[in-house]
Amino acid sequence: RNGAQGQVFDGGHKIKSVKVISVTKGKSTETEAKFTISDTRMQVFLPQELKSKGGSVKIKIDFSFIAPFEGSDRMGVLETKNGKIFTIAQWYPRMCVYDDVRGWNVNPYLGASEFYLEYGDFEVSITAPSNHIVVCSGELTNPAAVYSIEEQKRLAQAKLSDKTVLIRSADEVNSLSKSVSGATKTWNYKIKNARDISWASSAAFILDAAK
């Protein structure tokens, strides 16, 4: 839509496996599931029918993809002097909506149109380079694992302040965080009763907060 800027598009999601998870007598079993893909839609064939009146199924999809430089406004990679900014949206498989008017709504995603989505609860873990800040829909559940002691103090101050408090200033952007050893940090977020979830990650982010 916005031009590839010389990037070779690899076709989108690479599906490694699709499995159905079942639990019998406390033991979890993963079974390979057959599936078919048509444009942006996947149909998964369950090994047995889903029971009515409250039946449920857990499906595990192992997939990967390369974020495009230009992602139709919702996703992309921006080059800055302090590092790349990655913005990620519509990046994971979604269930089609089942409603009492049309049944399954299986229209494909259509560019600039709005998406018809179910509400649900999300829990995500995002592993990024240790000098990145990751922002995401919802609530960060492990701030002590990803922010330095000083940043945690500033966040605590911001929760009580009507004025903006800098958590990570422009002068600190190039300073590596000492809060976690190793090359990466994992940020855990959760949100309840939401239509969707998106996130962004960069070493170039300046962060502030207030009550």
Which residues make up each language-model segment?
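A surface-exposed beta-strand-loop module
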Residues: 2-83, 173-182, 186-187
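Surface-exposed, acidic/Ser/Thr-rich flexible loop segments
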Residues: 42, 48-133
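Hydrophobic helix-coil surface modules that form long, contiguous segments used
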Residues: 90-104, 110-211
